[in-house]
């Protein structure tokens, strides 16, 4: 049995490269749907969706913000995501729980580095999407070029649904190709009134050709449309829309619309497209849920449809510190949840109680008593929940796959300025750790300094700013440092036995393990095969946990060990003799010695860059990148500028924006994202005693 309201629900995200106009689009959506009585502007610092002080001051989105609105009797749960690579976890966790997405492109800049990154993230979760080519009013706007870039860079087929009425400064509206009409947006009421008119005679042939391309795309998903198309019979717009929707749901095509959010043009047709083409939770694929680790590990995952009558299964995808308490954002995939319910956090194996439930409107709340499958809410009272945890009923334990957490690449040493700051710092950092799984904290064993690790300089800058503003903690900061990775160059096998008296008891255990390189980008894999005398299940889990923790702490340098496969060849268990402490001590020391024998080496992060610079400065910029051990991957001429694609070690890119602005006289821009790890140079290996 399903809830009839689910067909009138959409869970969507707004994703794109930074500055493509995501939040500007979101603000118009709230205004035209009646959820907001004014249009907030990013450049004025009063956007509803950018509610953090840092967002308002910097004019960028830092945290994914959830709200809801209504259009054509359909409720839309909307998440506006950041575009900056330092906050990519916000996109990752949003796409993990959303049913669909709207991808925003700039008509001037086109497909940019972070656009490709968020597109790949959407591909990984098979998220259906539609697209808006925004900023059609800007000088240099070229929607045809953007379409061509989409065709070249993405496997999903773009289908142009609009043609522009005017270009650049004369952009006045759009031609709805499928319906055969012009749409303009009144300037007297900030675009709230949409006016229709006939297509000018001189554009008729252009529109007919564009409509033919739409019908061709639809015919791939409807044989009857294909037959009518080949026979030259008329095809109604409703049939075409239904076929296009099927293509969208399979992620094989994406309708593309035109607009200018800042000029209040093109948002209402985009909202119509959300309803017409994107799925309800009922049309989303069933979610795979497995028994928790302490249950039957051999059982096949259950495929749970979106059913309010099914077993409760929800994912905690975001945690905020709200006045010292946890506010946990949930996507409910199956079953229902009420305020006051006692539930199980199956990821951590602990009981939780839901005190209250809220529907979020940015940072404002609307209290609700119950939430059903398919919906997104926030809960208060979940004391243990962290990002990626599964919530279910104790009598029906289930476990969802967690989130893919990118590894941080930049670290920063901090010291409290005053004695009272030293006392407040640990609690403040703990609350920030709740919120952000890409943020890490450790203490330097030699200096005693607190080391913050994050996705980039901006990420850590925001963290330290929040320490001051939200928690009243002042810190001194050092220079940002690269977070390297350890790996091994060869294979090695080692047998280690631990036998020692500790506090009056003999602790004993032995392990034979092998470590081997697994290939760049493969991460860490620990293999613990079954044998004739297997360890008890609890000891197996503790052994794996111990090895994971040892690898995270590093072997020689304190940097995590990665791109290796560790196989437990033998771990004998003798009842009454083998102890947990002895077994784990043997494993820890055995791993250290095996990794050392296998030849430890350091890897450094390499970043993919996309730079836009004036043509006259391109040669100088390329030369400076090559001096930084960079590699040029591509060069594309765009009117009076050059688009440079390159890769360079992160260690060479700190403060690069200032250098680029100096070289280009303030006219150059760049974006970067993590690409891969390469062996660190010899001087770094020597510094850490590995050469």
From Swiss-Prot:
Residues 7-282 form the tr-type G domain. One of its GO terms (biological process) is ribosome disassembly. It comes from the Bacteria. Pfam families: EFG_C (PF00679), EFG_III (PF14492), EFG_IV (PF03764), GTP_EFTU (PF00009), GTP_EFTU_D2 (PF03144). The gene is fusA1. GTP binds at residues 16-23, 80-84, 134-137. PANTHER family: RIBOSOME-RELEASING FACTOR 2, MITOCHONDRIAL, TRANSLATION ELONGATION FACTOR G-RELATED. Catalyzes the GTP-dependent ribosomal translocation step during translation elongation. During this step, the ribosome changes from the pre-translocational (PRE) to the post-translocational (POST) state as the newly formed A-site-bound peptidyl-tRNA and P-site-bound deacylated tRNA move to the P and E sites, respectively. Catalyzes the coordinated movement of the two tRNA molecules, the mRNA and conformational changes in the ribosome. Keywords: Cytoplasm, Elongation factor, GTP-binding, Nucleotide-binding, Protein biosynthesis. This is Elongation factor G 1. It comes from Syntrophotalea carbinolica (strain DSM 2380 / NBRC 103641 / GraBd1). GO terms for cellular component: cytoplasm. It is found in: Cytoplasm. The keyword Nucleotide-binding applies. GO terms for molecular function: GTP binding; GTPase activity; translation elongation factor activity.
């Amino acid at each position: 049995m399903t809830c009839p309201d689910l067909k009138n629900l959409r869970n969507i995200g707004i994703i794109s490269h930074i500055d493509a106009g995501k939040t500007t689009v979101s603000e118009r959506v709230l205004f035209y749907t009646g959820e907001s009585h004014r249009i907030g502007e990013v450049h004025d610092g009063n956007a509803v969706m950018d509610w953090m002080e840092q967002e308002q001051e910097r004019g960028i989105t830092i945290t994914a913000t959830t709200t809801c609105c209504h259009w054509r009797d359909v409720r839309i749960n909307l998440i506006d995501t950041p575009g900056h690579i330092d906050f990519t976890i916000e996109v990752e966790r949003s796409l993990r729980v959303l049913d669909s997405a709207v991808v925003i492109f700039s008509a001037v800049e086109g497909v940019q580095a972070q656009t490709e990154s968020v597109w790949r993230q959407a591909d990984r979760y098979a998220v259906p999407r539609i697209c808006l080519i925004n900023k059609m009013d800007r000088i240099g706007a070229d929607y045809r070029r953007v379409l061509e870039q989409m065709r070249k860079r993405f496997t999903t087929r773009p289908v142009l649904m609009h043609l522009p009425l005017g270009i650049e400064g004369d952009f006045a509206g759009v031609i709805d190709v499928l319906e055969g009409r012009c749409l303009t947006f009144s300037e007297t009421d900030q675009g709230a009134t949409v006016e229709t008119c006939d297509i000018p005679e001189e554009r008729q042939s252009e529109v007919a050709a564009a409509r033919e391309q739409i019908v061709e795309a639809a015919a791939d998903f409807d044989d009857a449309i294909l037959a009518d198309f080949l026979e030259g019979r008329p095809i109604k717009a409703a049939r075409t829309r239904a076929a296009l929707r099927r293509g969208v749901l399979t992620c094989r095509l994406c309708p593309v619309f035109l607009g200018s959010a800042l000029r209040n043009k093109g948002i209402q047709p985009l909202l119509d497209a959300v309803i017409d083409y994107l799925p309800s939770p009922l049309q989303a694929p069933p979610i795979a849920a497995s028994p928790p680790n302490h249950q039957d590990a051999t059982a096949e995952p259950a495929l749970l449809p979106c059913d309010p009558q099914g077993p409760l299964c929800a994912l905690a995808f975001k945690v905020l510190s709200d006045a010292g308490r946890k506010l946990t954002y949930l996507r409910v995939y199956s079953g229902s949840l009420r305020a006051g319910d006692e539930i199980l956090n199956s990821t951590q194996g602990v009981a939780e109680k839901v005190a209250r439930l809220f529907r979020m409107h940015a940072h404002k709340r609307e209290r609700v008593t119950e939430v059903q499958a398919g919906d997104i809410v926030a809960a208060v009272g979940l004391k243990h929940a962290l990002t990626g945890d599964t919530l279910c009923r104790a009598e029906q334990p289930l476990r969802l796959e967690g989130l893919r957490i990118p590894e941080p690449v930049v670290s920063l040493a901090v010291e409290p300025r005053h004695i009272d700051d030293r006392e407040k710092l640990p609690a403040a950092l703990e609350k920030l750790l709740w919120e952000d799984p890409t943020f890490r904290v450790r203490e330097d064993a030699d200096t005693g300094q607190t080391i913050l690790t994050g996705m980039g300089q901006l990420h850590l800058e925001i963290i330290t700013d929040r320490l001051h503003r939200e928690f009243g903690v002042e810190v001194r900061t050092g220079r940002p440092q690269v977070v390297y990775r350890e790996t091994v160059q060869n294979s090695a096998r080692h047998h280690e036995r631990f036998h020692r008296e500790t506090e009056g008891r003999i602790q004993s255990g032995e392990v034979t393990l092998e470590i081997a390189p697994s290939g760049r980008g493969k991460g860490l894999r620990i293999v613990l095969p079954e044998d004739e005398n297997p360890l008890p299940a609890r000891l197996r889990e503790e052994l794996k946990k111990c090895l994971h923790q040892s690898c995270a702490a590093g072997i020689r340098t304190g940097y995590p060990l990665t791109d290796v496969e560790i196989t437990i060849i033998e771990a004998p268990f003798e009842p009454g003799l083998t102890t947990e402490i002895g077994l784990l001590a043997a494993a820890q020391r055995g791993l250290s010695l095996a990794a050392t024998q296998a030849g430890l080496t350091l890897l450094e992060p390499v970043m993919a860059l996309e730079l836009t610079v004036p043509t006259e400065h391109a040669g100088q910029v390329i030369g400076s990148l090559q001096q930084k051990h960079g590699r040029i991957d591509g060069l594309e001429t765009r009117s009076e500028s050059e688009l440079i694609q390159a890769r360079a070690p992160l260690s060479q890119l700190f403060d690069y924006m200032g250098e680029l602005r100096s070289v280009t006289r303030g006219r150059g821009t760049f974006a970067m994202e993590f690409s891969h790890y390469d062996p660190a140079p010899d001087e770094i290996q020597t510094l850490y005693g590995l050469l």
